[in-house]
């Protein structure tokens, strides 16, 4: 575990990315998230958060592609991960727990919303609405399709992927 810590460049701003959510319609495509990571990893140190065997495996693969990207999944306890989260300059999260945890530490949280909506009451605590990226309401007028994101029409299941990586990159630069 300390081998990872010794490789992390703490002189750069730290961006945490939690690319998963409980429901698929709330999860941005990993391919598009890799574009975001590839664009920002030269300037920032990227820490990846997630849980579960499958997620951890995917994050490990992403981290092995770039010397400034580190997967903390399965490498650190939740308590240790919270220590990292508390030191982030920015957390990028889906509508999921990691964004809420970061917000409780006063970390700026950029949330990416699929079939849910922050106005339904689940925006991270004390965060500007400017830190939320939403799908286009004209294209997907039925959003939110459910409060938790567990129900959505078939044609909405990929709505979150209509958000261009460039939009996320631009928002990161505005916030940080």
Task: Name each model feature, range by range.
Residues 6-12, 42, 170-176:
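Short, Lys/Arg-enriched, disordered terminal segments
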Residues 30-115:
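Donor-binding and catalytic core of enzymes assembling or modifying cell-surface/extracellular glycoconjugates
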Residues 26-29, 160-161:
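Aromatic-acidic/polar surface patches that form glycan- and anion
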Residues 1-26:
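Mid-sequence helix-capping/hinge segment at a functional interface
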Residues 6-8, 38, 123-124:
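Short secondary-structure boundary/capping segments
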Residues 3-6, 57-58, 80-83, 141-146:
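Short, solvent-exposed polar/charged micro-motifs at secondary-structure junctions
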């Amino acid at each position: 575990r300390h081998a990872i810590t010794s490789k992390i460049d703490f002189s750069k701003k730290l961006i945490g990315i939690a690319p998963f959510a409980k429901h698929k319609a709330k999860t941005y495509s990993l391919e598009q998230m890799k574009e975001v990571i590839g664009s920002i990893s030269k300037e920032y140190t990227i820490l990846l958060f997630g849980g579960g065997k499958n997620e951890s495996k995917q994050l490990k693969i992403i981290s092995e592609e770039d010397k400034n990207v580190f997967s903390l999944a399965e490498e650190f306890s939740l308590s240790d991960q919270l220590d990292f989260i508390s030191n982030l300059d920015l957390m990028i999260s889906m509508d999921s727990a990691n964004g809420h945890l970061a917000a409780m530490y006063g970390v700026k949280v950029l949330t990416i919303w699929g079939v849910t909506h922050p106005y339904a009451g689940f925006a991270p605590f004390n965060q500007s609405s400017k830190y939320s990226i939403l799908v286009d309401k004209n294209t997907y007028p039925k959003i939110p399709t459910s409060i938790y994101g567990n129900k959505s029409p078939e044609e909405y299941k990929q709505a979150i992927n209509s958000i261009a990586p460039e939009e996320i990159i631009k928002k990161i630069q505005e916030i940080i």
